Amino acid sequence: MQNSLDLKPISHVNGTVCLPGSKSISNRVLLLSSIAKGTTCLTNLLNSHDTQHMLNALKKLGVRYNLSDDKKTCHVQGIGGPFHLSEAISLYLGNAGTAIRPLLSVLSLHKNNILLNGDDRMHERPIGDLVDALIQGGAVIEYKKNKGYPPICTKGGFLGGSIFLNGNISSQFLTSLLISTPLALKDTTIFIKGNLVSKPYIDITLNLIKIFGVNIEHDSYNVFYIKGKQQYKTPGKYTIEGDASSASYFLAAAAIKGGSIKVTGVGKKSIQGDIEFANILEKMGATIFWEDYSITCTRNKLNAIDLDMNHIPDAAMTVAILALFSKGTTIIRNIYNWRVKETDRLSAMTIELRKIGAIVEEGRDFLSISPPIFFQYSSIETYNDHRMAMCFSLISLSGVGVNILNPNCISKTFPSYFKDFLSISKI
């Protein structure tokens, strides 16, 4: 395993990047295909650690699938309803929040004895609000170490009914319930307490659920109404669009040191909220050209921005790097949920930005960033967080280069990232 990657100063970027499949969509449709009636052909599936954890779990749960040699096409034979297991099993899910959270709800629909486990960071990522919601619907769930955190064991028992869910920690909790509750024995009404974070990710979930034949109504994201005793049905074939969060690094590179870069796989017809990043780039001064399935960014003078980025927390990290190349002070607001991601991203970003000379103020839920007078060559700690590694690769566009520690952490979502990044770069 590579301990570090030294990126030399890059003078210019230009070209086209074909994006890997979206992580958020890949793991959602793998699960939906598994519990739907019929066989689903998934194309442009993301090949990464997180999707592999989901595939491994589904196999242990009895799902039959055929994965192509390049791991981008998967034929999934749906079981037509909840998982029924006659014996106790344990599922290891690494640090894949997009796997453990939706699986917990689906596995709580039927009498089971299933342990959901993960790596050390997973044991620090909160899941208590989701567990509380499931218990309200009749589920029996036990914490195996610390209350509110994995590992956890579900015994089943979820029936539906009226559920109150905190919405201010992670949208994945609501996604988990939205996927499972159509299969519950009773109708379910989900009342959201507080402000719902990352609403575009809920839109992804609702869109995909509809593609699999189920429609869910809601009242301005405050109350969700789900009919029980439904069945998901295969759409036959589904092509996973490119990962919009991953697109942000290449679009940002063009804004800083283009040339122009075209990313394919996302565009005007994308269902992912993170395509909003391109609009933010345009507000900062870059030139953006949209097509149905591609976005092109061309360099222009960049100016600071002050914006609430709660709706695009992953792509907002890339804005923190753009701030270093922009005139003025950039403020990224309402991003408390950075603290419960793969690492505490607010703290990690502050520490690493200061290393390279930026002036940073870290608040409870915001970052204020002013560009450095001079960029300093630094070794960047990635905290085993794929997005830290990819974000800070852009420092190589500053003229001083950068050393990325533990670069292999990108395997969580984008194993070929550095290869693709260097392919559009000129030293």
From Swiss-Prot:
Look up the EC number in the record and give it.
Answer: 2.5.1.19
Keyword Hydrolase carried by entry: no
What subcellular locations does the record give? Cytoplasm
**PROSITE patterns noted in UniProt:** EPSP_SYNTHASE_1 (PS00104), EPSP_SYNTHASE_2 (PS00885)
Q: Which UniProt keywords apply?
A: Amino-acid biosynthesis, Aromatic amino acid biosynthesis, Cytoplasm, Transferase
Annotated GO biological process: amino acid biosynthetic process; aromatic amino acid family biosynthetic process; chorismate biosynthetic process
Q: Please name one Pfam family that this protein belongs to.
A: EPSP_synthase
Q: Which reaction does it catalyse?
A: 3-phosphoshikimate + phosphoenolpyruvate = 5-O-(1-carboxyvinyl)-3-phosphoshikimate + phosphate
UniProt-annotated catalytic positions: D314 (proton acceptor)
Organism's domain of life?
A: Bacteria
Record bears the keyword Cytoplasm: yes
Q: Name one GO cellular component term.
A: cytoplasm
Cited InterPro entries: Enolpyruvate_Tfrase_dom (IPR001986), Enolpyruvate_Tfrase_sf (IPR036968), EPSP_synthase (IPR006264), EPSP_synthase_CS (IPR023193), RNA3'P_cycl/enolpyr_Trfase_a/b (IPR013792)
Q: Where are the transmembrane segments?
A: none
Q: Where does 3-phosphoshikimate bind?
A: K23, S24, R28, S170, S171, Q172, S198, D314, N337, K341
Classification via SUPFAM superfamilies: EPT/RTPC-like (SSF55205)
Annotated pathway = Metabolic intermediate biosynthesis; chorismate biosynthesis; chorismate from D-erythrose 4-phosphate and phosphoenolpyruvate: step 6/7
Provide a Gene Ontology MF annotation, just one. Answer: 3-phosphoshikimate 1-carboxyvinyltransferase activity
Q: Which residues bind phosphoenolpyruvate?
A: K23, G97, R125, Q172, R345, R387, K412
Functional description taken from the UniProt entry: Catalyzes the transfer of the enolpyruvyl moiety of phosphoenolpyruvate (PEP) to the 5-hydroxyl of shikimate-3-phosphate (S3P) to produce enolpyruvyl shikimate-3-phosphate and inorganic phosphate.
**Family statement:** Belongs to the EPSP synthase family.
Oligomeric form and interacting partners? Monomer.
Matches recorded under PANTHER family = AROM/DEHYDROQUINATE SYNTHASE, PENTAFUNCTIONAL AROM POLYPEPTIDE
Q: What is this protein called?
A: 3-phosphoshikimate 1-carboxyvinyltransferase
Organismal lineage:
Bacteria, Pseudomonadati, Pseudomonadota, Gammaproteobacteria, Enterobacterales
Source gene?
aroA
